[in-house]
Amino acid sequence: MKVISFEGFEYSGKSTQIKLLKKYFIKNNIKSTFTREPGGNKDLEKIRNVILKSNFDNLSLIMFFFASRFALLSSIKKSDFIVFDRFFDSTYAYQKYNSKEKKLIISLIKLIDKKFIPKITFYLKLDKKNLIRRKNKRLYSNKFDKKYFGQFSRIQKNYEEISKIKLGERKFVSIDASLSANEVHDKIILNLKKCKLIK
């Protein structure tokens, strides 16, 4: 079982790339499970709704995210690939955590069964100019979109910070999300082949 995760700010094209990868796996008869965080199944979608509508403090949010995460991982059936739409990097990147809280997150990540640590994480990186352009085209945004849009630089810095932390053998790949959807998809497939995750 190989785990892949997708990360990036809203409007980076993350959902589009996940759909393209899903089509690629189906076309090539690769058995895969696609899920998202927070959420992932009927019960955990309820936790997702609580998180999105809440005003919890940082520690409570960390506990909610990891309770949901551990429950999701224990429910996943064996598959060739598990693909996450957001994983622990988002937990680290989005909130205004102090150094003590960040250490707690890393400690909790290290409690995750090694088989669930991603072999590769794709971070779709978008500059603020392109992000604003895409945001203005979108009709819908949730509470987190609105809340964190003004914190772009801090979130990007946190993504770069966690990318340098060694977590198992995972490879953290940053891709220019301003490229066309097909160009980004090609880079994703190329990196999966480079890492010998697919042929």
Protein language model regions, located:
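Conserved lysine of the Walker
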Residues: 14
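NTP-dependent small-molecule kinase module
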Residues: 22, 129-199
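Post-Walker A helix-loop "phosphate-sensing" segment adjacent to the P-loop in P-loop NTPases
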Residues: 23-32
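Walker A (P-loop) phosphate-binding loop of P-loop NTPases
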Residues: 11
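A glycine- and Lys/Arg-enriched "phosphate-lid" helix/loop adjacent to the NTP-binding pocket
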Residues: 91-157
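Hydrophobic anchor at the beta1->P-loop junction of P-loop NTPases
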Residues: 6
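Hydrophobic positions on the alpha1 helix immediately C-terminal to the Walker A/P-loop
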Residues: 17
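ATP-dependent small-molecule kinase phosphotransfer cores
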Residues: 33-112
